[in-house]
Amino acid sequence: MSIVIGNLLTDLPEATLAEVFQPIVERDGVRIERIVSHGQATPEGEWYDQEWDEWVLLLSGQAQILIEGETHPRVLKIGDHLLLTAHCRHRVEWTAPDTPTLWLAVHWKIS
């Protein structure tokens, strides 16, 4: 048995030029990762349309997520979480430009 210990809130990478995706665990169709954003948004006209479910928890910063078919983005603040089922088209409209936005994301695919 091995044990891995870390702290999601420390040693944040520089993310002012691009989002940083850092895998924490990958096992049998499940991936847990830390995402660090700093003012990024999904490019205009692009949508995420994933083959897997994704649950995200906002640990710091703020973000706005637009779900296809909705007229206004959902505002996420520290502690908010969101479940995006497979093929739920969505886009990140905004992340805080003045502070890192830190996400914990869990991805899984049911066969």
Language model feature labels by segment:
Residues 1-47:
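A short, N-terminal "cap"/entry segment at the start of jelly-roll beta-barrel domains
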Residues 29, 70, 97-99:
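Short strand-connecting beta-turns/loops that link adjacent beta-strands
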Residues 34, 60, 67-69, 86, ...:
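Residue-level recognition of conserved beta-strand positions in structured domain cores
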Residues 39-40, 63, 88:
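Short beta->alpha connector loops
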